[in-house]
Amino acid sequence: VSRVWIADPLASDGAQIVERDEKPGGPAQNLLTPQPTETWTVVPGPDREARVVFDLGAATPVRLAFLGYTNATATTQWRIRASDLVDGFDATSFWADGSTWGDASTWAGGFNSGFVDVWPTTGLGTWDRVHGFLKIDPIQTFRFWELTIQVAPGEEDSVFTAGRLYLGDPWEPPINMTPGASIGFNDASLVRRTPFGRLHTGTRGQWRRMVFVLQNSDEDLLFTETARLDRLRGTSRDVLVVKDIDRPSLLMEQSVYGVFGELDPVVIPEPANVFVRRFQIQEWERP
């Protein structure tokens, strides 16, 4: 079982987009803002592919690629490549000896994940929108990162949309959640019964909420990183919490993109000298 990952978009949100495929009204820049209904919108065209190249400004370590709120089907695939050269994704110029990107996952001068399914597991047709997760292991450090979407034959004229992109190195605490963590739906729908016994309902949107606790005797462990998250994300800037990146069958159910519901303090119970931090995250919008 992997430990929890807590990711923020600071590395990718500061990126410059140097190449893009997009439709008017659906710019690729929307991938770098925390409003998943404002989407990157593109029609792949005859080659069935659409891509965006991001300049992170400097060589940046990336261990997680997250593409959220997509309308990907079960056959939609994506690929992440990386280079330290702005033209590093041009197969005619990337290699000094003239060789091109192939299907291998890594090269001496860059990174190539190869095409993989956007859906982390099968049977996600009950979700309105699906998140894609890509664990980049070992971690890769490059300046330029390319996202490519590939649709199935016959879907080249279909519209593809995605609402959020993360590229970065999430915080993975060396301790896992303590027993008792919870993930579930909140439903604010109105339900009342009339004096005559008739039920009236007013349907409202649902969203998920995750609550978990980290505890350890190492003071630096909890104070340093949690203070950074509190200071930089607060309760209004988005974060992504992934319970277990290595369990694709539950990645959709056990990962929440949203905001911290509260900034709980680090508690020091006496006399145990164990530092405890409770986390709450509420979903931005149900996918």
Predicted regions and their residues:
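Extracellular/virion structural assembly segments
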Residues: 1-50, 55-287
